[in-house]
Amino acid sequence: MAAPDFDVQQLPHPVPPPDEDGSTFEHNAALKAQYYGRFIDGFLFADDSGLEVDALGGAPGVHSARYAGLEATDADNNGLLLQRLTGVADRTARFVCVIALVKNSKLVHLFRGEVEGRILDAPRGAGGFGYDPLFYYEPFGCTFGEAFIGDKMLVSHRAQALEAMFTFLRSLLSAEVTLPA
């Protein structure tokens, strides 16, 4: 997501990650942003994202990256997901991204993006990462693993959340929005 009117930078030095112990994307995104916000002055954002499958009660959810274990690979996670969906007809799913924006470690706002799709019976495509080869996106007629990266970036859950955040920041900087004290 291009935001030429903003100078987005990474932290200037390596910082060990916090424990992501929340049960929601919102909690984990806020936890990370507030944690990393201690190391800089001003605005900082962090995200938490993952895949929710309706038939699995929203799993893998916040555990998407470590669904099959702490050291699991994408192939391990995809394999476990397919195993748990064996014989399941309803494979509706969504990618979710929540971005937490903080200023001086104080939570300012949360932004959520979602993209709906369904999980196939087998992976298709070598592009993307994570669950992309299993996630079929109807408007494209293919999986995110088969989609052109530029097309995927236009509709992704992360792109939606980022665009919402940049719109908010533009409003804030033009004084259309004010921060609570």
Where do the language-model regions lie?
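Anionic-ligand binding patches
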Residues: 1-181
